[in-house]
């Protein structure tokens, strides 16, 4: 199942060259590789920090600060719970900024729905930290969230 899920994220990565954010999609693909095929969860979560920064910069209509990539090796020094807190803060900032800056449109609704599904996925992952993980439930939220974020990231009108 992991290979099929990874192929879906790879498809979203390819789709991102059409109207998405290829850098965010590449970081997502890399994060998922670490989370699905290795035991290096800190590396996966560190790449998800970069994903959130890429989306935040898009909403701010600013280029991705290339120096931010140096967060990756530094983040590996932090314990996993601290990385999770940093990720959660960036993700909630992403949601907040998207709700404020994105003008009303069909694309906005799809983008925000993608963020909602992503949040549901992350809450499921957090819940699974205390219980037996349910990968199918995680991917039920994650796969469509990545598709919606990919196809709407560049077309959402921003104030």
Describe the residue ranges of each PLM region:
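Polytopic alpha-helical membrane-helix bundles and their juxtamembrane interface segments
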Residues: 1-159
């Amino acid at each position: 199942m992991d290979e099929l899920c990874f192929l879906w994220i790879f498809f979203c990565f390819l789709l991102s060259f059409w109207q998405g954010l290829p850098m965010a999609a590449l970081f997502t693909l890399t994060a998922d590789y670490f989370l699905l095929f290795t035991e290096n969860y800190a590396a996966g979560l560190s790449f998800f920090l970069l994903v959130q920064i890429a989306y935040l910069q898009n909403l701010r209509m600013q280029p991705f600060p290339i120096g931010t990539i140096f967060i990756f090796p530094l983040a590996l020094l932090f314990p996993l719970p601290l990385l999770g807190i940093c990720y959660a803060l960036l993700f909630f900032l992403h949601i907040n900024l998207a709700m404020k800056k994105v003008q009303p449109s069909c694309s906005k609704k799809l983008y925000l729905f993608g963020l909602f599904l992503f949040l549901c996925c992350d809450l499921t992952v957090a819940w699974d930290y205390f219980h037996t993980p349910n990968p199918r439930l995680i991917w039920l939220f994650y796969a469509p969230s990545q598709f919606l974020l990919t196809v709407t990231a560049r077309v959402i009108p921003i104030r």
